């Protein structure tokens, strides 16, 4: 079967109508989505282009209506009657004929003619939901309509014979498989049917009574008893669909030869890993390690639910009897329960009867939950079924009023992190084992080398010892020989001495006495010499110790002297620099004074931008003298300085406006400057000159003057708000934008100027400056918004103001919500305060809820670092009935 798209009435194909021929009443084992062909030509519609708007609510249920072409029976039976519906796809409208002269018009998100192709149906109905599922949101696509209007054809057609006839289930899985990675992501499916209020597993027929389990904390619904099959490719999925379809209950009725007797529910579970960077360990002790420190891995779990509802039927038309009658009752009861729940959600009823049917329990996340939901309602053209068609259309209209709160479900993938760390640990263990083995091999090699060296040394030592022994023995023998010869010689001399003993005895005794005296003298001399040497050594030791102490003292003194010299040199350099600066300042002040005295524009002042920055550091000098600008103002006169603002010389004009800006920083000078006409001159500079320096300093001076309430009123009266808005639109320099934003922020703090600020474009100018993105500019913008919101809140409390906030009127709420949790503390603090003040006015509550501000208020009441803001947020949420109702509806813990 094929369905072709229709754009602006152009026909590309046709749909084969459902056959109404009666056949056997047995359960069909073939695919029930086969619909016979032969459709008449589609009706022409106007070329207007007005669609059903979604009111800017991203979570609203999108509803499309699809018309089935006439089948053979209807072509014969209704040949003399016009179709009960007329489609206007360009306008996204449908006209329902109540009779020949009365029609009703309905708008839908999409209107699909009988010629619309399966591809177009998928792209406008299911593809946005599939893309959301790939991004981490839950999604639901559901088909609703009278039996025989093509729900199963639209949703579950396999397209074996004709690829173009593939239904939403097949095309959705193709996109999901194409948008995921088999390495990091996983896809699993469950295929169920709700038959006679019993949940049965189409993939495992023996599992015919599956229980519904609800998480008491989150309210999530799960079916732990269902079969989950992991999908690796498209062919695997097609085989599962064929298996499930053979187990689905179908029967032959008067309205449809293959009428579904159960609600088919295909659940596709997608788990995707969020890729994040990993940073290596930078510790010096682990410089050689292979560890990396991964951030906590995130896993997004999403679920796509495709629901092929059984068709509603009227018993007298379908001819159901016996068991088929009980089936029809069960189908109609579950569809009725679903309609009641949708009515309750659409009307914001405090009670939604979700537990009236297992179908509503399974679909609680699809209507009023966190899933992105698309509903396709299928209708037939026959006027005989005008009542069923009207009921189906009204069901779709009510479903369009349901708004869901979309939410991404993320969790930390500790299992993946554990596996990754285990792999790294295995690598480190293997590397450690390799290093340990290499170390052991090195130790063994060194031991072998040492043993070889020792053996070689022992061998050499033994050889040397043997040689030394031989040498000693030879020397010993020679010594013995010499001693023997000497002994013989002495014996001979002794014998000769005996003969000459008497003569030699006298000589020997006298010689002995002399030698003895000489020896005693030598011993005395030696002893005295030793004593002298001891004295000299002791004296030398004392002198050495004394010299060492003196050397240490000299070294210490030399170091102190060097430090003093270095310090003196630094001080002399600082004195030189200070003297040069003093001379330069004196020279510049004299130049300015002479220039002011003469008042001649030709004598240009050549000073640089550093003069105001030097003088702004201190208002009074150390010795109690006045600051240079105050002294200059007293000596020259404020009026002459203001006259120089209109000088033709650019340098004089720039330095004059800098002097005025520095004077305006002092509260005592602000009133004098305003009285002397300085404010008018500064506004003239903003209006007349495009020099960025002049505009920046002039805006800064105006910002200083805007701190005074009298000056604020004068700024507004002289068109300062419009002028500041124009400057903000033209300027690109962040510092200029910071000055302009600061001036407007100061004006926002005046209760009397609220309406004028809004009408003159001050708020829009403030919001326009966020394009810069500079933190200082954003901080001033946030401060202005906080001041404005505070004044509005005070005026509302006093009964002076009513109606929505002007900030919301100018579209400031999205930016406020976006930066409510900004990393910069000044921006975050001001935005949190602004949100609290906006929330105090009940008329702003609905816009704040739709804009996402409620979540930020809850966060502020719990996490804000400042106690006063935290308590203000908590008090505001507690006192607002609208916020309390929404918090209860969303189930927020507060």
UniProtKB/Swiss-Prot annotation:
PROSITE patterns xref list: ARM_REPEAT, KINESIN_MOTOR_1, KINESIN_MOTOR_2
Record's compositionally biased regions (Polar residues): 603-623
Chain's gene name: KINUB
ARM repeat feature ranges: 626-665, 667-707, 709-749, 751-790
Region (Disordered): 1-53, 530-550, 598-623
Species whose genome carries this gene: Arabidopsis thaliana (Mouse-ear cress)
The protein's assembly and partners: Interacts (via C-terminus) with NEK5.
Tissue expr: Expressed in the basal regions and petioles of immature leaves and in the root elongation zone.
Gene3D superfamilies per record: Kinesin motor domain, Leucine-rich Repeat Variant
Keyword Nucleotide-binding found: yes
Span of domain Kinesin motor: 60-402
Protein name (record): Kinesin-like protein KIN-UB
Biological classification of the source: Eukaryota, Viridiplantae, Streptophyta, Embryophyta, Tracheophyta
CDD domains: KISc
Top-rank taxon: Eukaryota
Location(s), subcellular: Cytoplasm, Cytoskeleton
An annotated Gene Ontology molecular function: ATP binding
Motif range (D-BOX): 372-380
Keyword terms, alphabetized: ATP-binding, Coiled coil, Cytoplasm, Cytoskeleton, Microtubule, Motor protein, Nucleotide-binding, Repeat
UniProt-listed Pfam families: Arm, Kinesin
A single GO BP: microtubule-based movement
Function: Involved in the control of epidermal-cell morphogenesis in roots and helical growth of roots by promoting microtubule depolymerization and limiting the accumulation of endoplasmic microtubules. Seems to be involved in the control of cell-file rotation (or twisting).
GO cellular component: cytoplasm; microtubule
Binding-site residues for ATP, renumbered to this chain: 145-152
InterPro entries xref list: ARM-like, ARM-type_fold, Armadillo, KIF11-like, Kinesin_motor_CS, Kinesin_motor_dom, Kinesin_motor_dom_sf, P-loop_NTPase
Domain notes per entry: D-BOX motif functions as a recognition motif for the ubiquitination machinery.
Coiled-coil residues: 423-588
PANTHER family linked to this entry: KINESIN-LIKE PROTEIN (PTHR47970:SF30), KINESIN-LIKE PROTEIN KIF11 (PTHR47970)
């Amino acid at each position: 079967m094929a369905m072709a798209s229709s754009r602006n009435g152009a026909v590309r194909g046709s749909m084969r109508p459902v056959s109404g021929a009666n056949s056997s009443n047995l359960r069909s084992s073939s695919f029930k989505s086969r619909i016979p062909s032969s459709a008449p030509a589609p009706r022409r519609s106007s070329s207007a282009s007005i669609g059903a708007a979604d009111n800017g609510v991203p979570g609203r249920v999108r509803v499309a209506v699809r018309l089935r072409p006439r089948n053979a029976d209807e072509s014969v039976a209704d040949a003399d009657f016009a179709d009960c519906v007329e489609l206007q796809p360009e306008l996204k409208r449908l006209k329902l004929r109540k009779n020949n002269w009365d029609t009703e018009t309905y708008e839908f998100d999409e209107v699909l003619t009988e010629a619309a192709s399966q591809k177009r149906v998928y792209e406008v109905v299911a593809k946005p939901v599939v893309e959301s599922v790939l991004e981490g949101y839950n999604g639901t696509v559901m088909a609703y309509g009278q039996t025989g209007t093509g729900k199963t054809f639209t949703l579950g057609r396999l397209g074996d014979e004709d690829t173009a006839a593939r239904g939403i289930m097949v095309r959705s899985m193709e996109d999901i498989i194409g948008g995921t990675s088999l390495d990091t992501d996983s896809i699993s499916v469950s295929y169920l049917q709700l038959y006679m209020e019993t949940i049965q597993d189409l993939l495992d027929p023996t599992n015919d009574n599956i229980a519904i389990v609800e998480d008491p904390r989150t309210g999530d619904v799960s079916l732990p008893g269902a079969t989950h099959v992991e999908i690796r490719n498209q062919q695997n999925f097609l085989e599962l669909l064929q298996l499930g379809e053979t187990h689905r209950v179908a029967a032959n009725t008067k309205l449809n030869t293959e009428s579904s007797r159960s609600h088919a529910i295909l659940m596709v579970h997608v788990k995707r890993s969020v890729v994040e960077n990993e940073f290596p360990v930078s510790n010096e002790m682990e410089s050689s390690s292979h560890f990396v420190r991964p951030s906590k891995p995130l896993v997004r779990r999403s679920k796509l639910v495709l629901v092929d509802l059984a068709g509603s039927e009227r018993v007298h038309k379908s001819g159901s009897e016996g068991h088929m009658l009980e089936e029809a009752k069960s189908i109609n009861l579950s569809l009725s329960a679903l309609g009641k729940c949708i009515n309750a959600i659409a009307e914001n009823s405090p009670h939604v009867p979700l537990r009236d049917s297992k179908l509503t329990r399974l679909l609680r996340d699809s209507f009023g939950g966190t899933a992105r939901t698309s509903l396709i309602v299928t209708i037939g053209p026959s006027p005989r079924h005008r009542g069923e068609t009207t009921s189906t259309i009204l069901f779709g209209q009510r479903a369009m009023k349901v708004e869901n709160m979309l939410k991404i479900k993320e969790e930390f993938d500790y299992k993946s992190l554990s596996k990754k760390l285990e792999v790294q640990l295995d690598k480190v263990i293997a590397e450690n084992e390799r290093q340990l083995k290499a170390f052991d091999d090195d130790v063994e090699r060194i031991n072998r080398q040492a043993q070889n060296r020792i053996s070689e040394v022992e061998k050499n030592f033994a050889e040397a010892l043997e040689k030394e022994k031989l040498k000693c023995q030879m020397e010993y023998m020679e010594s013995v020989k010499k001693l023997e010869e000497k002994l013989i010689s002495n014996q001979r001399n002794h014998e000769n001495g005996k003969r000459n003993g008497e003569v030699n005895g006298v000589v020997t005794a006298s010689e002995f006495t002399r030698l003895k005296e000489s020896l005693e003298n030598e011993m005395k001399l030696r002893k005295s010499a030793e004593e002298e040497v001891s004295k000299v050594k002791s004296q030398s030791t004392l002198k050495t110790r004394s010299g060492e102490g003196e050397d240490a003292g000299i070294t210490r003194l030399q170091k102190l002297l060097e430090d003093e010299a270095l310090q003196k040199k630094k001080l002399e350099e600082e004195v030189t620099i200070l003297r040069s600066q003093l001379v330069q300042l004196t020279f510049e002040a004299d130049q300015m004074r002479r220039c002011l005295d003469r008042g001649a524009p030709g004598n240009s002042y050549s000073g640089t931008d550093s003069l105001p920055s030097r003088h702004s550091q201190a208002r009074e000098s150390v010795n109690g003298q006045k600051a240079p600008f105050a002294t200059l103002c007293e000596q020259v006169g404020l009026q002459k300085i203001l006259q120089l603002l209109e000088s033709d010389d650019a340098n004089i004009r720039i330095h004059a406006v800098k002097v005025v800006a520095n004077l305006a920083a002092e509260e005592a000078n602000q009133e004098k400057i305003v009285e002397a006409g300085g404010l008018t001159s500064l506004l003239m500079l903003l209006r007349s000159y495009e020099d960025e320096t002049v505009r920046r300093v002039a805006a800064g001076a105006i910002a200083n003057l805007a701190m005074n309430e009298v000056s604020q009123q004068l700024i507004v009266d002289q068109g300062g708000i419009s002028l500041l808005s124009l400057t903000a639109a033209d300027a690109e320099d962040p510092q200029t934008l910071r000055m302009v934003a600061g001036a407007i922020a100061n004006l926002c703090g005046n209760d009397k100027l609220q309406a004028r600020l809004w009408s003159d474009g001050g708020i829009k100018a403030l919001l326009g400056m966020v394009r810069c993105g500079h933190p200082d500019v954003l901080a001033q913008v946030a401060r202005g918004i906080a001041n404005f919101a505070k004044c509005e809140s005070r005026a509302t409390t006093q009964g002076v103001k009513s109606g929505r906030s002007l900030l919301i009127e100018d579209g400031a709420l999205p930016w406020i919500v976006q930066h409510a949790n900004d990393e910069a503390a000044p921006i975050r603090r001001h935005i949190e305060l602004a949100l609290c003040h906006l929330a105090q006015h009940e008329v702003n509550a609905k816009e704040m809820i739709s804009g996402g501000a409620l979540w930020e208020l809850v966060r502020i009441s719990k996490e804000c670092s400042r106690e006063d803001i935290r308590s203000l947020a908590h008090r505001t949420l507690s006192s607002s009935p609208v916020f309390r109702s929404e918090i209860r509806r969303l189930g927020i813990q507060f």
